[in-house]
Amino acid sequence: MRHRDIPVLLFLFCCCASAAFAVPPQTSPSFAPATTLTPYLYKVSLVQAAPGKLLDLIDVYKSQAAELKQAGDEAPLWMRHSQGDHWDLLILWPMGSYSEYYQPERAGKRQKAAQAGKLDEKFKELIAWQEDLFAYGPPLADLRKAFAAGAFFHVEMFVALPGMFGELYKEREMENTYAKALKEPENFIFVRNQGAAWDIFTIGVFRDLKHYAESADALPKDQEAAAKAAGFEAPSQIGPYLRRFIREHHDTLAVAIK
């Protein structure tokens, strides 16, 4: 949670890309973002490189992205860990929907591209740990626009307490209302469909670290008014309110990959 204290952080589900993959039912999240009339599906990969192999791994992912684009897939959106959780890379693979992503022709092209580049063998040598999640999120065009303008990211990942998913989603929206009132960037909200345990994760996109920390300059009276308008008792109560609904919460600061 990025609230007014600004604690600036210093600190398998493997998907087979073959035509034989059984396509899961196409369902919409119960708490889809209001701006997402047709929920957009992403495959989200959290990856930790083998020791000393991060730059090599980034190069292989760049090659894979180029090959997949030729096969008809959308280019991924990604970032590199700076401080926080243990993953090195977060990669958002645009899918759209299960049905379109796993169309036999498209899946076949993807498989041929992987085989031609011997990608599976390379990834086995370069990856120490990987976690995959399928999640519904914002329209791809909105995300690309934000990533094109930003180079610094704040990622928050949550596992909700039993029965508290709806309240957690609402809290994420409340924080966006708070941020909007202070003229700060709002978070993109993603909702789990299947895969890793994270129920919700959000990505805040900023120009740089200085932009991320600018909220500390907001006047106390403006913070107070924004918090109450969003439904919080006070700015200092945003964190305690969030903790009512979560079992686990990971924060990460990340930077763009050029």
Enumerate the predicted regions with their spans.
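N-terminal secretory signal peptides that target proteins for export/translocation
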Residues: 1-6
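Bacterial N-terminal signal peptides
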Residues: 7-20
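Short S/T/G/P-rich N-terminal loop/turn motif that feeds into the first structured element of a domain
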Residues: 22-258
